[in-house]
Each structure stands twice: as C-alpha cells, then as structure tokens.
Amino acid sequence: MKKYSLHFLTLVLAGICACTPAENGNKEAKKAEEPKEATFPQLAGNMTIYEVNIRQFTPEGTFKAFNEHLPRLKELGTEILWFMPIQPIGEKNRKGTLGSYYSIKDYEAVNPEFGTLEDFKATVDKAHELGMYVILDWVPNHTAWDHPWITKHPEYYAKDSLGNITYEADWTDIALLDHTRPETRKKMIDAMRFWINETDIDGFRCDHAGHEIPLYFWEEATAALDPLKDLFWLAEWDEPRMHLELDATYNWSILHATEDVAKGKHTADELYESIEKDLAHYGHSPFRLLMTTNHDENAWAGTVFERYGEGHKAFAVFTFTIYGIPMIYSGQEVGLNKRLAFFEKDSINWHDEKGLTDFYKKLVSLRKNNAALWSGQYGGVPAKIDVDNENVLAYSRKKDGNEVLVILNLSNQQQEIAQNAELSGSHQNYMTGEQVDLSGLKTLKPYEYIVIIK
C-alpha cells in the first residue's frame, strides 16, 4: 500500500501550494513553491504527459532519431515521456507487416526496429538531463504466441475448457496470461525490475490494468518495485479501486463524454454532470488522465479533427483546465491529421501547418505554473458558473490565492449567455491575449474559449 498517506498527505503538509505572484506582466500564473522533499509521483501533479510512438515519430523510427526531438519536447513543456512498448514483437500470428507493440515476445529485450538497449539507456539519460521523466508502457496481460514461456512455462497462461491457451476478443496475436498463479506474477515483476535497474526508467503505464489482472498483482508489483526508486504508475483502466495502489487512471468516461458533446449527442451541461459523477466516484485526490487523443483513439476512432471537428481546441482547453493530468499524443501538437497505421510504418509529418504548437505550449505552461489547475487535491475543485445555456460550460478553479476562470462554447453555433455576478470586469484572455469585458459578455462564437487568470 503506498499512495494516499505517503503521496497526498506529504504534499499537503509540505505546503506545495504556498504561492507567490508571478513577475510577468500577463499574470500567466502565481508561482507555487514545490516542496524540497517531494517525490516524482507528487511532483507529477503539475506535469503534462507526452505519449511517444517511436515507430512513427521519425522516418528512421529509432531512439537515436527520437533524441533529436527531446529539446523540442522540453520546450513544449511536457515533462513525463510515456514510451509505447519497446520490446521485440512476436512473429507468430502477427498482425500486419510490423505487428503490434502490445504483442511482446521478450520482456527483457529491445525491439531491433527501434535500436538497442544501450540506445534506449542513452535516450533515458538525455531525458533526465533535460529534467524529464520516462515511463515505459508495460503489458502484463498477455504475450506474443512465440514468447518462450509458451513452450517452457505453459502453466503461466490462461486456458479454455479444453486446456488450450486462450486469447482475448479479436486479439489473435496474443496469448492471455494467468495472474492467479504466483509464478506468473513473480516472473512479470522480475521483468519490470530489469528495466528499472538497467535503464533507470521512472515508472510504468500499465496496459489493460484491470479485468483479467487482479489488484493483488499491482499490490505485489508496487511493494517490490517502489523501494527501488520513486516510481509513477499510470493505469489504463477506469475504476476507483486502482488508486489503492497506482497513482493515475485513465478517464475514459470523460474522453467519450467530450466526443458525445462534439457529435451533438450530449450538451455541455451533461458533460459537467459526468464530471460531477466522476468526482463523486473517485474523490478529488486521485490523478485522472484526461486527453482528446491517444494511440488507440487515433488509430481506431479517428483524428482529433474527425472526432472534434473545429472544436478540437475548445476541448483541448477543457482537458487542460477542468481537473486531472493532461496528455498529448505524438504529433498532436503539430495538428496530426491522419490515423497512424498501427501495424505498419507511417511516419509523422512534423510541419505545423495549423500553427498548434504555441497553442499547446500555452496550455502546458498555464497548468504547470498555476496551482489552481494542478491534479488531484493539489489543485482546486472545479466550480460551475451558471450562464443559462446548456451548450456553454463555464467554471472556475481556486487554490491558495490562484484562480482560473474558463468559459467554453462547446457547440458549432453562436451561443448567448446570461449574466452572472462571477463574470465581471475586464480581463485578458490568456489564450488569445485579447481583452474581454466579462460584465458585457453576451454572446460566444462557435467553439470560442476564454481563459482568465485572476
């Protein structure tokens, strides 16, 4: 058991949100003093995660080529680099030409497509030199069909009624592991330990963290690995119980709720109801991962432009300001406008035709430097502001003298809003630099977003 008493209470006692005004004229933030003794999981409260798709990141698709982008990602402001799985991919029952990252045939080796173990070590070292953290995508649920365990330790695997090793859904390229067996769990944890000891990574993004994987696996994993160093654990699962052991969980429900609003299936008011429900289920302390895209959404559901249309910026502002820990997927910051092939080579075009880099840089910086927007109990609880329009979402967040006010038109039509005492005075819209007279604000353009720092 590790998370709340150690990570949350320590921060509260350390006074992480003892804030002082920032010196810059545009009031970007009131700087917060971070505790000297804070661990990485604690410090993640004001960080942004960046998902790295090595295969598609450069024409070469290697760690060495990716290293050239590290200074740019540092300038973007992202501080946690999540690498999709980097291990060798199975050949038996492989999907496509290159196969899925998530069909692993050796947990303790590097996919030669990406480079060598030494190459990855160098990437981690360079990231650390730039003050960034590295977490590795970990796939404990299944292996490739040509993983050595298939023949040497078939008892590690789940079997059907006929005694045959089984797979899940249409994932025909993977064999399902049985984590009710202590030997399976031990071998998996040993492999995770290898990457910490050999490459000095800072944590794990835990693929498919629930369902077939019992919570006691994560209890054993954190108990065995947390003493090695301060680790950050991100679960690809949307269930409160995961926070008994892990730091952050996917907020799939809010992601899909935003997509429903963009499609016109739900209103902004209904989106806020989803937020209230989420807070009721999880409380305010856990880190909830928010995003508008990731490798799954991009490959199978569509680009942000397909799913959000002209509203992609407004929904990005929402994910960075409502609560939780935000994430940017490879290429999102330059307007990636294609579904990246999942089993083939499909390089990202890094030409920022839509001019989005500065937009995302501003969002990352805003959240980094304003304690009101930090994750969990380190930031403020969102408070809805009534503007008498179901398509407009207005809210504020406050924390220790910091306050951010957000107004979002989440529709493709002009919207009228009612006056509210909380909307008063003339302020600068942080995102555009324009002055906004809140007292006289009556209409919002389609997908207009206003962010005020008070």
Residue ranges and their predicted role:
Residues A316-V334:
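Conserved short secondary-structure transition element at the edge of the structured enzyme core
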Residues E34-K64, E68-E79, P85-T199, F217-P227:
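Substrate-binding/active-site clefts of carbohydrate-active enzymes
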Residues K27-A32, N197, D207-M291, R307, ...:
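Active-site-proximal helices and loops of the catalytic beta/alpha 8
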Residues M1-F8:
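Bacterial N-terminal signal peptides that target proteins for export
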Residues R55-F57, I86, V139-N141, A209-H211, ...:
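Active-site beta-loop-alpha junctions enriched in small/polar residues
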Residues L9-I16:
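Bacterial N-terminal signal peptides
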